[in-house]
């Protein structure tokens, strides 16, 4: 009985540690007229690359071409994604934007009424 509690606690701690080691990023693809290939195939290629490097697509946008991804906190992984997006931009003329996802407010929090 005590061993099962110990295993449950270990799994919980491992899960929390693993979840805290992810960062969320937004990847968008503005419409470009001078592209050498189909934009949708480029987006699918980037999504496949993200999954291959250990990322997870958490949301796909419908109003704009893009998605949100959770990536492991690693400079090497982030640099690899940046290099891939840069290559796609130079090779196919597809503009790619990558930004860290963060909370945004219309007003300074000091103006909020309690």
From Swiss-Prot:
Keywords: Phosphoprotein, Signal
Signal sequence segment: 1-19
Highest taxon in the source lineage: Eukaryota
Any one of the GO BP annotations: vacuole fusion, non-autophagic
A single MF term (Gene Ontology): endopeptidase inhibitor activity
Residue(s) carrying Phosphoserine: 41
Disulfide-linked positions: none
Family per record: Belongs to the protease inhibitor I9 family.
Note: Present with 319 molecules/cell in log phase SD medium.
Protein known as: Uncharacterized protein YHR138C
Taxonomic lineage: Eukaryota, Fungi, Dikarya, Ascomycota, Saccharomycotina
């Amino acid at each position: 009985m005590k061993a099962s509690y110990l295993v449950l606690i270990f799994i919980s701690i491992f899960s929390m540690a693993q979840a805290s080691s992810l960062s969320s990023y937004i990847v968008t693809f503005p419409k470009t007229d001078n592209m050498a290939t189909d934009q949708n195939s480029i987006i699918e290629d980037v999504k496949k690359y993200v999954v291959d490097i250990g990322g997870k697509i958490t949301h796909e946008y419908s109003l704009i071409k893009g998605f949100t991804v959770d990536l492991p906190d690693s400079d090497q992984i982030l640099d690899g994604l940046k290099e891939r997006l840069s290559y796609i931009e130079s090779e196919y003329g597809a503009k790619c934007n990558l930004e860290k996802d963060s909370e945004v407010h219309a007003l300074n929090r000091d103006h909020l009424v309690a």
